[in-house]
Amino acid sequence: MLTPEQKAIVKATVPALEAHGETITRTFYASMFAAHPELLNIFNPANQQTGKQARSLAASVLAYAAHIDHPEALGGMVGRIAHKHVSLEVLPEHYPIVGQYLLGAIAGVLGDAAKPEILDAWAAAYGELADLMIGIEKGMYDAGAGQPGGWRDFRPFRVARKVAESRVITSFVLEPVGGGALPAYQPGQYLSLKVKVPGQERWQIRQYSLSDAPSPDHYRISVKREGGGLVSEYLHGAVQEGDELLVHVPAGDFVLQQSERPVVLISAGVGITPMLAMVQTLAQAGSQRPVTFIHAAQNGSVHAFRDDVARLTHEYPHFRKVVFYDEAGPDDQLGTHHDVAGRLSLDAVRGALPAGEAEFYYCGPAGFAGAVEAILDDLQVPAERRFTETFGPSQSFAPVILG
């Protein structure tokens, strides 16, 4: 257990970590992968190449150090990390490896400043965090495998249908090989896919949001084709109906809360996928919760699920939509295909927002999430009624300790 003296040492190292955090994490990843190349099967190499993962880990380490006296303050973020780890099949034996190379990187970058008492304090702090994460993740693994239809690790699914939803987004309907019932998921959660792209030495793991209401016999994900994206290009271009993909049990903490409050769903681009699962689930359950569905797309050619959302306006009496096109095409009709020309703005959505203390869910790229945060700040929406998912590593203590 960390002593008060060790906690004080960890907190005192925050300025040094702020100054050298990204260098430490880059050094950590390079040395760990050199010694344990098998871990490259867990990590997204694109995030390594761009430095996103190094920045993300540096931010995580800083947040942990700053909250070392009261780690329970990071409870929600720890849960998000645990969900991501479970989706990657991170195991207890991975934690000592990470600890060894993280401490080695701290020692190497800080040099003479890394006194033995500093390294001992950080070893104790990391040990406590590892024990916490291992315990939480064990509970998640046991729950995932123990529920009806559940499983552990990755299992084969067959692509039953492949459907183009827009010029850049394609849906994959997945059924378990051998059949059988599937465990239900919470709308907003995601699947992890493990694929071996031809010509690549390592397995690739990616997460994709489930994009419809839960079904007992299939899952659906909807994937945006990213220019230069190794896995998305492979899924769009090579994977066909009848092919098999390895799938992990659903995970994720960006889920619809069990309340009776009005719901505001705000998305951009492929961020529409978890929102569609949420609103379809409410509609199928006959919920009385008012839903305002706000979506931003470049234009109609990339706007996925337009017809699905339009149907909801007729089938779900408590549903209202506002669609923004910031670069409408010649065939995009204002009032039919989209409701507002231009970018998402507070003035344009204020009149569509429900009365009362609504819950706000928003999903999209990091820049979009920042714009939504500014709108919610103007509306004085408290943190406990904000729920968000950002694709890619977050720049806060929300991504992952390992991957």
From Swiss-Prot:
Signal peptide range in chain numbering: none
Catalytic residue positions: 95 (charge relay system), 137 (charge relay system)
Pfam hit, one: Globin
InterPro entries in the record: Cbr1-like_FAD-bd_dom, FAD-bd_FR_type, Flavoprot_Pyr_Nucl_cyt_Rdtase, FNR_nucleotide-bd, Globin, Globin-like_sf, Globin/Proto, Hmp
Cofactor(s), by name: heme b; FAD
One GO term (biological process): cellular response to nitrosative stress
Ranges of residues in domain FAD-binding FR-type: 152-257
Residue(s) at site: Involved in heme-bound ligand stabilization and O-O bond activation: 29
GO MF annotation terms: FAD binding; heme binding; metal ion binding; nitric oxide dioxygenase NAD(P)H activity; oxygen binding; oxygen carrier activity
HAMAP family registered for this protein in UniProt: Hmp (MF_01252)
Family, similarity comment: Belongs to the globin family. Two-domain flavohemoproteins subfamily. In the C-terminal section; belongs to the flavoprotein pyridine nucleotide cytochrome reductase family.
Protein known as: Flavohemoprotein
Organism: Deinococcus radiodurans (strain ATCC 13939 / DSM 20539 / JCM 16871 / CCUG 27074 / LMG 4051 / NBRC 15346 / NCIMB 9279 / VKM B-1422 / R1)
Gene coding for it: hmp
